[in-house]
């Protein structure tokens, strides 16, 4: 997950500042420690850019300016946390681009989306149906261990390791397409 980073001159950053909005800010979003452990490990500024990345990815916004002053390193850390916490956001590629100033301040984040973003509602339905099949199969089992083992074994038998698979590091690739690699 190596971002494409580009250092830009101050004048170009000023032009970006005048034309590029912050997109969705993610204000009001909350992420519990139990379900979203990576979010909890972030600094306050990193959490802010995490919420902004999450909200813009939900809205399929491609380019936006960070709402708070953050470094390129902070953006990378926040982006990796979003990817780790949200495998259900299968339409978001595991790489992004950013522009930053000589002092390291990030001034633009460019998210990348895979082909499922073109018909996201249908893709979500296929993903949810595949996930529901696993949940239904595990539901009658007694212990959490048995349920986890059922899901593990079902995935191991249904998914083929394929370096050339489309979206090969996503939950969608594994659940819907049946081909993936370890992320």
Regions found by a protein language model. Give the residues of each.
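N-terminal accessory/pre-domain segments preceding catalytic cores
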Residues: 1-142
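Gly/Ser-rich catalytic serine loop of serine hydrolases
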Residues: 181-183
């Amino acid at each position: 997950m190596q971002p494409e980073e580009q250092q830009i001159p101050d004048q170009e950053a000023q032009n970006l500042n005048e034309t590029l909005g912050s997109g969705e800010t993610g204000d009001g979003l909350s992420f519990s420690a139990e379900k979203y452990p990576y979010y909890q490990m972030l600094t306050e500024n990193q959490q802010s850019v995490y919420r902004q990345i999450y909200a813009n990815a939900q809205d399929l916004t491609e380019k936006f300016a960070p709402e708070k002053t953050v470094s390129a390193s902070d953006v990378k850390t926040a982006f990796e946390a979003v990817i780790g916490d949200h495998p259900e956001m299968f339409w978001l590629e595991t790489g992004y681009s950013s522009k930053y100033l000589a002092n390291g301040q990030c001034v633009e984040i460019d998210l990348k989306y895979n082909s499922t973003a073109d018909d996201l509602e249908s893709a979500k339905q296929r993903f949810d149906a595949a996930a529901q099949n696993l949940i239904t199969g595990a539901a009658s089992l007694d212990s959490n261990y048995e349920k986890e083992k059922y899901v593990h074994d079902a995935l191991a038998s249904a998914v083929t390791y394929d370096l050339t698979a489309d979206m090969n590091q996503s939950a969608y690739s594994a659940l819907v397409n049946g081909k993936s690699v370890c992320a």
